[in-house]
């Protein structure tokens, strides 16, 4: 079985990612963001300096390549920040490639069934917890030689697997999804969920509130973590009160736009 409290055999960066996963299972809150647009060499170091404990790199909406993702992960080496990747779809090649590139975790969008959750675990974890293919001495283990058994055990302890639940069907099945062994996080995709509910962007609507609470409860019962991200602190405050512990501020586009808008409005008031 996967031991979230196990000791990682890798370097400090790998150990930090393992520590993040351990903290999730210990019931602690973890804070970070998601990046859609500004994939520069300084992005992850800047977000780390700002206090992010994790960064999710988006491949669903951003259109970036695996080469860009691999570069971003390399820029994060040596920093105390976990780097997770949202892949565009649930396919073995999509999941395994970002892990081989060195990602500390994978988020899959539009996950709706327990069978899909089990597929994610199977694609992402090495035996005995999954069926991920073996390729050693590559980016994911920092190009170093080592004992394959130790590398696989370390990866299974470090990697965080995230189900992005953002449809009515996903909410209906969320208890079974979160019960899947090896799945760590249920992340609420609130805009897509309200869109599927026919109430796009209405986050105070009783149907959305009920769905958000249902996912939080499913995560609690399964011993997993409920996650949510937005640029609205009021929204995140409400999610935290519901039991969401993996919280994200942003994403990068929203934060940059809001920061410049606020500063320029203030500037125009006196200049």
Question: Model regions: which residues?
Answer:
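N-terminal amphipathic alpha-helix/helix-capping segment at the start of soluble metabolic enzymes
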Residues: 10-34, 146-157
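Active-site mouth loops of central-metabolism enzymes
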Residues: 26-39, 160-172, 225-230
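Short, well-ordered coil/turn segments that N-cap beta-strands
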Residues: 26-31, 52-53, 77-83, 103-104, ...
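Short, acidic/polar
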Residues: 36-48, 89-97, 169-179, 231-236
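Glycine-rich, proline-tolerant flexible connector loops at the mouths of alpha/beta enzymes
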Residues: 43-44, 52-70, 190-204
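Alpha-helix-loop-beta-strand connector modules within alpha/beta enzyme cores
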Residues: 66-87, 92, 96, 125-129, ...
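Conserved anion-binding
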Residues: 93, 105-181, 190-195
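Glycine-rich phosphate-binding active-site loops on the catalytic face of alpha/beta enzymes
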Residues: 107-116, 187-195, 245-262
């Amino acid at each position: 079985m996967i031991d979230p409290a196990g000791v990682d055999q890798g370097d400090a960066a790998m150990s930090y990612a393992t520590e993040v996963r351990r903290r999730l299972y210990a019931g602690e809150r973890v804070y970070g963001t998601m990046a859609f647009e500004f994939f520069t060499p300084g992005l992850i170091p800047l977000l780390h300096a700002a206090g992010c404990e994790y960064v999710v790199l988006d491949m669903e909406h951003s259109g970036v390549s695996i080469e860009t993702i691999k570069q971003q992960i390399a820029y994060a080496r040596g920093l105390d920040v976990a780097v997770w990747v949202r892949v565009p779809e649930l396919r073995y090649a999509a999941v395994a490639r970002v892990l081989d590139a060195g990602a500390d975790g994978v988020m899959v969008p539009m996950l709706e069934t327990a069978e899909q959750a089990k597929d994610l675990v199977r694609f992402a974890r090495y035996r005995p917890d999954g069926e991920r293919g073996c390729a050693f001495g590559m980016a994911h283990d920092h190009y170093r030689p080592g004992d394959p058994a130790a590398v696989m055990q370390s990866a299974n302890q470090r990697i965080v697997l995230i189900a992005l639940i953002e449809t009515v069907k996903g909410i209906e099945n969320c208890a079974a999804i979160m019960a899947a062994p090896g799945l760590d996080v249920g992340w609420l995709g609130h805009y897509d969920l309200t869109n599927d509910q026919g109430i796009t962007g209405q986050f105070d609507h009783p149907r959305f509130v009920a769905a958000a609470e249902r996912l939080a409860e499913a995560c609690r019962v399964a011993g997993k973590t409920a996650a949510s991200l937005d640029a609205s602190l009021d929204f995140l405050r409400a999610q935290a009160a519901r039991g969401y512990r993996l919280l994200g501020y942003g994403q990068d586009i929203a934060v940059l736009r809001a920061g410049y808008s606020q500063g320029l409005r203030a500037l125009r008031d006196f200049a």
